[in-house]
Structures are given as structure tokens and as C-alpha cells.
Amino acid sequence: MSLFGLIVSGRLPQSDFVAVDATKLLVNVPDIESVNYLVVFLTGVSPLPVGTSAAIYFSWPDANAAPTWQYLGHINNTKPSAIFKIAQLKKSHELEAQAHGMVFGSQEISHIAQIGVSLEPELTVAQQTPAVSTANDNKQFGQRMLENFFNYASSFGVAARDIPPISSETFVPFSVVQNWYTNFQRRMEQNPNFWKY
């Protein structure tokens, strides 16, 4: 029996993790489209080695590329199980595929995801940030920066009649800034990582 188990709501628990090397294991999760949360846990067969944690990773395999692993979080002897939300990770994968023009069948669609477990030193694992938190932090930072710029630029707004007739400054209509602000907000809501492409 494996050290690790996986639970997906409505399915039997899985413990068929396959060793990739001495510190890394994988398990396939079929029909991933309907899965929003999953649980990874220690089965209790034996404890993890002292000073180690099990870092948990998610990958949505792509037939045309190497797996991209996203860190979900960790479990260890003092925290033997954890629930991970993968709905946002699946959505960001779909948005990334659309951004790269892979919408209408130019890419094979995989219905099997993989969960990876990597035994790593506790200090290394403690310094990692889960993928979902990073995406949310990026979105929040982008929105705050957007609001700050909008407020700053709008504080300099003047009516056309107040612009000096002989001025070396370039003036931008405020409606242009408002349109940019609205478009940026919309795009940020649709895909917080749109600016990367």
C-alpha cells in the first residue's frame, strides 16, 4: 500500500501512486473536467522521513508539450491531509490554451490530469507559494495598480477651456483613460494573466 492517498468527491479513494524516482510519485486522475477539489493524505502506512514534507503538484498533461507542474501545497506528519482547489488551475490552463490559439482542435484535449508528490526538505516546501494564491495575488496587484493609476491620472483632469493656448504639454482626452481603465478591468476579470501573452 502507498504512503499517499487521493480522494475526489464521488469516487473511490486512489492510492495507486507510481514512483518516478526515489522522492517523486505520480497518480493519474481521469475525467478531470468535473473535479473542482481534491484531497491528498498520508495513509498511515508509515510516517514521512523526519524533516521532510510532501509537496503536492498538479499537471494537466498536454499531448504537444512537456507537463507544466503547478504547486498546490503540502502535507507532512503534523498535517497529514489537505484539500486543494483545482478549478482555477483548470480554468487558467484553458485560458492559456485560448491565448495561444489552441481553441478549435489544433491541440489534443486530455481528460486525465496528474497529481505529483515530491518529498522535499520542510524548509524548501515552507518557502513555496501555491499556484492559486499567486494568481490571486497577481490579479489583486494588477487591480490595485490600475485603480491607483486611474485615480492619479484623473486628479490632473482639466476642462478644454482651461488648457493654455500655448503649451508644450500633450493632453490626452479623459475618455481615453476611462476606456483604457474599463478594458483593462474587463480583461483582468477574464484572465488575470492576459498581460503575459
Curated annotation (Swiss-Prot):
Pfam families: Hikeshi-like_C (PF21057), Hikeshi-like_N (PF05603). One of its GO terms (biological process) is protein import into nucleus. It comes from the Eukaryota. One of its GO terms (molecular function) is Hsp70 protein binding. Coiled coil: none annotated. GO terms for cellular component: cytosol; nucleus. Belongs to the OPI10 family. This is Protein OPI10 homolog.
